[in-house]
């Protein structure tokens, strides 16, 4: 089996590849043949000169565009992933901690996401603006699970379809002067809510925050760790609505 792994890291986020690549090589689908696409503004950085790594150069966008536009970035390199059986996007700062089999990741469903550690037993912050293509109000959708945008993917053809659809939806929102509350995560959750029975949902231990969330660490095995970052050095995360167009 071949798995395509997508990394996006510009500015200081590129440095995470030094942890990301060896951890994925050691722990993630160890029996599979893994290929990486690294989107970065540092295409000449030697940290990306690794086996089975293809570098795709992008410029560094300010928050929230660097995350909002990820579907568009990926949609432009689908030809590189054509030979893959599965494709998986993993945040630059989400690092595998223990062996994770191919079956464990993807299950028997066509898509995969991870339950958001902050919204396990309650409804998550789905987009409520009916004018956004990510909006979930006035729709008959399954909102039983809210996933975090740090980890998602699926079988190749289903992944390709998801990327294409969400790239188009984000473009439509931007053309209408709209940005969803949680950017790409809002669009991903709308897409999953439309086809819940096709989504294999990983437990929150696949997105364990490095700091806090002790209840998550007690209840679930930490399979992947979301590294803690000083927001002064990594000013990427600004919270809901930051950068929203009116």
Regions found by a protein language model. Name each.
Residues 139-230:
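Catalytic core and acceptor-binding pocket of nucleotide-sugar-dependent glycosyltransferases
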Residues 71-122:
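GT-A fold catalytic core of metal-dependent nucleotide-sugar glycosyltransferases
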Residues 15, 45-47, 96-99, 104-105, ...:
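Short catalytic/ligand-binding loop motif for oxyanion handling, primarily in non-cytosolic enzymes
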Residues 10-13, 43-45, 60-61, 94-96, ...:
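Short, solvent-exposed loop/turn segments at secondary-structure junctions
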Residues 1-69, 77-83, 227-233, 241-246:
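N-terminal anchoring/stem segment of glycosyltransferases
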Residues 124-128, 184:
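Feature marking well-ordered beta-strand scaffolds used for ligand recognition
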Residues 128-144:
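Short, flexible, basic/aromatic active-site loop/helix in glycosyltransferases
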């Amino acid at each position: 089996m071949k798995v395509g792994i997508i990394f996006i890291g510009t500015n200081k986020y590129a440095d995470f590849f030094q942890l990301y690549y060896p951890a994925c090589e050691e722990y993630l689908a160890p029996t599979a043949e893994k290929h990486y696409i690294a989107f970065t503004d540092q295409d000449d950085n030697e940290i990306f000169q690794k086996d089975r790594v293809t570098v795709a150069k992008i410029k560094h966008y300010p928050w929230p565009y660097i995350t909002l536009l990820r579907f568009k970035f990926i949609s432009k390199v689908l030809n590189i992933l054509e030979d893959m059986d599965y494709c998986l996007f993993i945040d630059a700062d989400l690092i595998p901690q223990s062996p994770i089999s191919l079956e464990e990741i993807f299950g028997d469903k066509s898509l995969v996401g991870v339950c958001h550690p902050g919204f396990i037993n309650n409804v998550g912050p789905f987009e409520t603006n009916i004018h956004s293509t990510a909006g979930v109000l006035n729709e008959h959708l399954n909102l039983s699970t809210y996933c975090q945008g740090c980890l998602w993917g699926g079988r190749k053809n289903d992944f390709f379809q998801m990327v294409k659809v969400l790239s188009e939806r984000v473009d439509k929102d931007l053309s209408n002067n709209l940005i969803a509350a949680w950017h790409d995560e809002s669009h991903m959750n709308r897409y999953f809510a439309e086809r819940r029975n096709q989504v294999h949902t990983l437990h929150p231990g696949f997105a364990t925050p490095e700091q806090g969330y002790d209840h998550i660490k007690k209840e679930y095995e930490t399979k992947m760790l979301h590294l803690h970052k000083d927001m002064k050095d990594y000013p990427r995360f600004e919270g809901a609505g930051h950068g929203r167009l009116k």
